[in-house]
Amino acid sequence: MAKLAPEEMWKQMLTGNYPRLHGMRRMWGALPSPPRCKLCNAPFRGPGGVLMRAIRYGPSPLNRRLCKWCIRSAHKHPGGAEIEISVLFVDVRGSTAIAEKMLSEEFSGLMSRFYGAAAQVIDDWDGIVDKFVGDGAVALFIPGFAGSDHAAGAIAAARGLLEQTGNDGPEPWIPVGAGVHTGKSFVGTVGEGDARDFTALGDTVNTTARLTALAGAGEILISTEAATAGGLDTTGLERRTLELRGKDQTVDAWVVNGSS
């Protein structure tokens, strides 16, 4: 078999079409037991899980549904590919004012609770936590990991975040706003040496960040692209035409809150 160009290899890996992964999925699938790495199918529990941990295939800190080998492989082969993904941003609203009313240790505990809740919900919907930044989180929903319905997963995760933070009711334990967008993005490893990181870059990521900045507490702004790709039922939802910082064209988005 001819050697794939790096970009084509990345594209196949990110979309779930890499032949080597298919072989690994069959091989690891013969070992018990679930849960498993969503990419290579390595078992994380049972006898197979013991073996995987011994050879450093255990769950990755990046996401407990990815194994360390898959993450290391991504870092070992720098590069990436442009594919369609869905991106979710979630930010704490009024964090400066909240911090002013609390001791530093109390605020740190509150943010740790938020990060934990965000990571769990994102993981439950097969997203990958790209990073925690200040008072927010960024998640990527990639076809090879989240499936072809990655947009629906991103929307469901955003709704789950409202629920887990109490923003589906009148008294959230921490106020958050979120944004979801779907589009083409460069996904892969960037940087040099030990500073190399797996991430997504491009207008899709930037647009999601700008949407999130305009979402009020308890709101999710979902771009029409994400809504269409995710099969969102927009009956009764408010539609906003937004001017996003740094973009020449307006962006239309649907508003979802805890009661919708």
Task: Give the predicted meaning of each segment.
Residues 181, 187-212:
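Catalytic-core segments of nucleotide cyclases and related cyclic-nucleotide turnover enzymes
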